[in-house]
Amino acid sequence: MTGNNNSDDNSNSLKTKWGNRFIIAAIIQGGIITGMALGTVAFQLLTTDVDIIQFLSLSFEGPAKWFFIGIILYLILIVAIATTAVFYNHLEINLKRKFSKVSNILAWIHLFGMNIGGAGTTILMIFAGLAGSGVLSLFVEGKLGNQDVAILTSFIPYIAFFIVILSIGVICGGIAYIMAYRSKA
């Protein structure tokens, strides 16, 4: 085709390594939450005694809110990772900025920190909500357990640990972005 300069076959086509990495990460994270959702639906289909989502919805004032907040934050994380890919794409393609050795290291920390810290935080919140609401007992023992608000306290240090990893990743990403933005095209 004439006039189409965006073909992958074109050796002069522009590429974005960091944009691609973050898009792939967003796709993987989307796959993880899809797997979690399908697992919950499959378990619900096999367990007709309790409507898991209805139970969690009715007990939203208790530990179950951690489940829903974890799910919502996980979805926000996926959108944030994809949005980050757009920022890196803008730097690498539109502004034609190059990453130095240091900014590459910071971008790697950003990628891992955002994905490990963000996913760890949200998955632990989801798990804490299931454990504290008694729904986890349904998966493990086959019967609905008692609600236990105190169990949430045991998750706080681990959630905080993953939040620190997430924060370090995002801060390093911001520094990498500024360094690349200020570099010459």
Predicted regions and their residues:
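Hydrophobic cores of alpha-helical transmembrane segments in multi-pass integral membrane proteins
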Residues: G19-K96, L106-K184
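Membrane-water interface regions at transmembrane-helix termini and the short interhelical loops
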Residues: N12, K96-K98
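Juxtamembrane inter-helical linkers in multi-pass membrane proteins
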Residues: T2-N5, K98, G142
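N-terminal juxtamembrane cytosolic/stromal segments of multi-pass membrane proteins
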Residues: M1-I23, A185
